[in-house]
Amino acid sequence: MDITKWLVTGDTHGDFTRFYNLHEAVPKDEIWGVIILGDAGLNYWLSKRDKVNKGRIAHKYPRLSFFCVRGNHEARPEDVEGMDKVFMPDIGNYVYMELDYPNIHYLMDGHEYMFDTYRTLVCGGAYSIDKYYRLERQALGGYGGWFANEQLSQEEMENITNTFKGEEFHLVLTHTCPWSWQPRDLFLSFIDQSKVDDSMEIWLDQLKENITYGVWLCGHYHDDRQLAPHAEMLYYDIRFLEDIMEYWLEDLDTTTL
């Protein structure tokens, strides 16, 4: 598979209808890669319902190849029955995928990839602010959709820091964002923020001081906006990765990246 263009978008939560017009624009002899910044929602129900949705996506969008950062409202791909770990030469590292759905791939936390010519670090996961509502629904016999290992563990965060401290990346892809960039105007007023576990956001703040990066992209907060210089949050927009990178990297000396 030779991917000719790369795009990036935010949370889809299982609804891939936004990609219909994009797929129609892809030449019939090309494949375009789409990075989803977490909560793709393809491993949410852990039942036949997920399989039906993935089958529909694989059939409907054959000229799009999806690469999913892990969000919080979905199972870790390694916990999903039938997942294989496959090396992908296009991006230079391993992904998880189910062979029945060849255009859906799950990026691995704490791994580096090459998207186009951009050295990229990927760190998925986040805390669910509706955790207790989901657990209550589950206790009443409904489906909660809460995953105990939704966040990176302390050990995982430490390993990522130790592995990549001092490294240089063109691009960082995360689901949530560093604590200092959080869009607090989007916080839900009925959520007691003192009960929210923001350990991952605090760690990401530390990580961004321990690596060099050109651009940082995240999802999670359901809005499209700039968070800081060289940092953007995506939700519904579908952007060409090259356009984002060229915009932010034109004022940087990237010869050492």
Language-model-detected regions and their locations in the chain:
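Active-site-proximal beta-strand elements of phosphoester/diester hydrolases
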Residues: 3-13, 117-126, 171-175, 233-237
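Short, solvent-exposed loop/turn segments at secondary-structure junctions
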Residues: 13-14, 41-43, 73-75, 125-129, ...
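Active-site-proximal loop/helix segment associated with metal-binding centers of metalloenzymes
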Residues: 91, 116-198
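A short acidic (Asp/Glu
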Residues: 18-19, 45-48, 78-81, 132-133, ...
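Core catalytic region of metal-dependent phosphoesterases/phosphodiesterases
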Residues: 9, 14-115, 193, 204
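A structural micro-motif
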Residues: 4, 64, 104, 118, ...
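Conserved beta-sheet core of the metallophosphoesterase superfamily
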Residues: 58, 65-69, 86-91, 180-255
